[in-house]
């Protein structure tokens, strides 16, 4: 039940959410509505509240407990438009066993900020255009997410995406593998030139052969360096594996930096050489005319030097020009992973290729659709809901960016250090800090993989917890490792694949229809898929018993719901 007082206080039983505003409320389909612009009315948090925010698939924050920074600091989080820190236009505040949902009718123009003050986190919502804000109290956060899905435009389900790109079916119960040469980082991130060839070559086929011989029957291998494109065909012919090629239409190396940074990337990363032709004419510009910056490279001086960001409109044109000849040369490719492009939207003020935020979304959707029209499985980094119809999978969506380790983008084939493992255990793998917002809204529409710098096997001591999260959320695994580390990781990779694959084959095409926490400490959680299959996990160190069922520590139960 939702009721409203004057001044505006939304109540449900003893739970109250106060809105300090003079706006006159309306009601529509059970939601209270307000018209607003600029700073939007949001209740202040109270001690004991939890905020559930759309960072990648979703995070849950006890508002009175500060989070130590990892890749980003939460207390300075400000995201104005749809991006990986705002994948859904939905914000949840949990208080007294109830959940207040807040959304607007224009996600593209709604942003939020999180700040730490007076011993707790505070949430601010803003809009750069007039919007209708909707508020409603639900009994559970899961019910709020499901109601949000019901009020959104219909999304393209994975079943329809498989119908148009049949190879995608291989990822239902499958996995993505990024297998790296032991010296790849000397080429990618060193501050000196090297003659080392970064291609993984035949060693990747050896790993693939071992995986296949041990039951990994569904997989897609990511190929990063151009020299490894020749592996796409034997991966398909020998093992039935898919191959996708890494590509980048964002990071542009200023030719003047050749000689300042090592030439390794120019010589070995085909996309780097292809991007340089668009400097400076194709670079996105700010309102003041400055060139947009992008991923930094280490120079001979040991310092990092920023590249520049290609305008999304120019990027879309380059995809249409460059990818077909590559596919003609390597027809065994079945996918394309476009890094960075799916992480957000922006503007460009260069008069040769101007873009508004709305234009940018249209351009990016068209670019991804063009890959689909080439018959490719379409993937990107993170993604957000307005892109979902044109994407098949997203790497990083299952690894909330604010909980990743610092520099995880540069450490995407390393085994965690003790300090990195401790940070991941504290947040990324802590069940109280995660919540499957994206899965409750769109599980049947997108495949959400981990980030390659937070891959399934990266913490051998924690791989069981990674496996439990994947099963609970119905997400497939992603493995990223060097060939030299494969022998020590092999057993854990195979065990996790077998466990996750079995669950994902059963639930991968279903909606997540319910989700709940079964214990006060959040260690035992339950997800329901299609109102048919339940997955229950115990993240705790004590056995859990209920309804005649016993679940051991780090235990997993899944199957048909008991009637």
Positions of predicted regions on the chain:
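Active-site-proximal substrate-binding groove within the catalytic cores of carbohydrate-active enzymes
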Residues: 12, 20, 24-30, 35-37, ...
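A short acidic, amphipathic alpha-helical/loop segment
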Residues: 206-210, 230-235
